[in-house]
Amino acid sequence: MDESALTLGTIDVSYLPNSSEYSIGRCKHASEEWGECGFRPPVFRSATLKWKESLMSRKRPFVGRCCYSCTPQSWDRFFNPSIPSLGLRNVIYINETHTRHRGWLARRLSYVLFIQERDVHKGMFATNVTENVLNSSRVQEAIAEVAAELNPDGSAQQQSKAVNKVKKKAKKILQEMVATVSPAMIRLTGWVLLKLFNSFFWNIQIHKGQLEMVKAATEMNLPLIFLPVHRSHIDYLLLTFILFCHNIKAPYIASGNNLNIPIFSTLIHKLGGFFIRRRLDETPDGQKDILYRALLHGHIVELLRQQQFLEIFLEGTRSRSGKTSCARAGLLSVVVDTLSTNTIPDILIIPVGISYDRIIEGHYNGEQLGKPKKNESLWSVARGVIRMLRKNYGCVRVDFAQPFSLKEYLESQSQKPVSAPLSLEQALLPAILPSRPSDAVDEGTDMSINESRNAADESFRRRLIANLAEHILFTASKSCAIMSTHIVACLLLYRHRQGIDLSTLVEDFFVMKEEVLARDFDLGFSGNSEDVVMHAIQLLGNCITITHTSRNDEFFITPSTTVPSVFELNFYSNGVLHVFIMEAIIACSLYAVLKKRGSGGPASPSLISQEQLVRKAASLCYLLSNEGTISLPCQTFYQICHETVGRFIQYGILTVAEQDDQEDISPSLAEQHWDKKLPEPLSWRSDEEDEDSDFGEEQRDCYLKVSQSKEHQQFITFLQRLLGPLLEAYSSAAIFIHNFSGPVPEPEYLQKLHKYLINRTERRVAVYAESATYCLVKNAVKMFKDIGVFKETKQKKVSVLELSSTFLPQCNRQKLLEYILSFVVL
């Protein structure tokens, strides 16, 4: 591994607040808010920051603004220019100044007094929920329908018995579903959590300006929906605790029924949690559960009608990879349906970003190694609490994005020209199999005709809800602060995999920090860089080896090479991936374009077409689309790739060729028909642009040169390594398909593929050991299903895979492998 990548000079003055109290080692006794940043001029600048002033003199970026394109009215709502300057606050730092009392006794009882003064009472929460849900027309119809199915030809008396039986079943379901919030339990839990959080977290930081926006939203007398990313089981308690501390009523939390365990389930119910099935629609026999769906719909409608707040985890389950997973919009669809029926005037949506230095679960190595997930139990919860009390988990940062109007979003989408989304098969097959008949291209073009805006149209409704879910998750992910462990893990895996001196690691940490801030992401730490790096190394524990070198009396830091340790480091490294993912996609696409050019022996090997690079990158975005939300749904991959190439030009990594150089391009290069190998929708053109836009049809394609400077080349290499594990997993899965003999049940195939990847890692064939995580195995197989490599059928509720007719020929499977390998930098 080239140890000069991201070379970035000497050290240090970190992104410091004026108050020295906020260094990592002293944040237990930190002041309530972080001040403005003091600075000295940095001795060095990074590869991409040469084009702008050092960030040492600028304020923290304010994250979480809503989308101006989709919700322009919400953009100015709740926000004012003073909001960003309100600074951060450590929620678990409580003393007498946070109460109405002063003196020695107040200092001793500050936690009790603080909890007692919080505004929480029974009248805040929903009443008569079970009765109102059972009496709703939709539930009554569902009960009658299910009863009729149970007794299709019975007498009136038998029908009445069937109805009563179904009603009893409905009441039993609602007992599990409906929460009975207890203000006393919220207060008690608040006090316990204040004690516990102070024992195993350094701090829990929130932005006071963001909380001001949330408070302003609560005064609108509308229901609020909090939609956080899901990293840990602590997420359930964290939001309720923060809102309680700020006198905002607790939300009703949608929890998976895997947490419905004795004693613990009672606590969750008392705090506002309600349990739902993992799959909303299915009964044990695989049929649609009309009754359950009606009860869930009625429950959500009743809570929203009573202006209650909800907390929904769109990812459905905790992320095992450290990345924000793709959205599961089942429960969100119920919220949208409620608003569409005009039951309530509006709903305010609040995405929430949550970042941990270290999650309390520590890692998910067991599941990533293919072991079955252990069911939660009271004993496992107790063991988890005991384990937590013996460790420190560093810092936590919670960011509340700007609330936006769901009604405004839905109305704006209904008025926009909306094209049917391009499937992965339509987007990628023409690039993978260019000699194949272009029916997929024609299909994609036909689908671009504007469809009916009738909200009753099912396909439009599904697309609308899916886009909304992606919008929310992208904003929540963009709001997540980057933690010290994320940066250190990333540097050790993709910058210094062979190890590095501590002083150099600190220098690169400092620069990575500036790179993150330059891209308008916030940091979840502050203090001297050396202290912060040591803090992160301590938290990463056995994943890192520290040795003392007598050569220069330095500490040498090396990432552990064992598979579980690499998996764990990759989990934390993925916390910073979304900051650089678009640039990493451009870097890998740049390699693919240059690699193709090199094999063909073009006359001007130093020049590449900007349009070709953008389209290549857009296709890679499609390939990686199962790895999470890459962009806002109101943007296209073509658009964001074009913008990212523009940033590369700003950085100086790419330069626009002089006119004389462009005129010397050989006809073979200028007339390449690569554009005919991709569907037209990949060539994005906005309907809102002027004729003079840079994207105008008259614009001539320009040609670019790649900077040959050492630091630019090293930065490109670093970006390419970030996607290395993903691309290696996908290419290895493509190799494994060569010996496919089906049909095969999907669970069995996943197990075999995962075993193959683990064997590659154990035999040290794999470049990146983290390419063998079970998450990447599942995503690779899903991608193959989406592009039409596999046909999927259901047999006894089990998904069965077999090769599609397109990929039965071995040559087409080879082309799939070659296409993926074109992006892989060896």
Curated annotation (Swiss-Prot):
The modification N6-acetyllysine is found at residues 778, 782. It is found in: Mitochondrion outer membrane. The modification Phosphoserine is found at residues 380, 686, 693. One of its GO terms (molecular function) is glycerol-3-phosphate O-acyltransferase activity. One of its GO terms (biological process) is phosphatidic acid biosynthetic process. GO terms for cellular component: mitochondrial outer membrane; mitochondrion; plasma membrane. Transmembrane segments: none annotated. A motif (HXXXXD motif) lies at residues 230-235. It is an enzyme of class 2 (transferase). Its EC number is 2.3.1.15. PANTHER family: GLYCEROL-3-PHOSPHATE ACYLTRANSFERASE, GLYCEROL-3-PHOSPHATE ACYLTRANSFERASE 1, MITOCHONDRIAL. Mitochondrial membrane protein that catalyzes the essential first step of biosynthesis of glycerolipids such as triglycerides, phosphatidic acids and lysophosphatidic acids. Esterifies acyl-group from acyl-coenzyme A (acyl-CoA) to the sn-1 position of glycerol-3-phosphate, to produce lysophosphatidic acid. Has a narrow hydrophobic binding cleft that selects for a linear acyl chain. Catalytic activity is higher for substrates with a 16-carbon acyl chain. This is Glycerol-3-phosphate acyltransferase 1, mitochondrial. It comes from Sus scrofa (Pig).
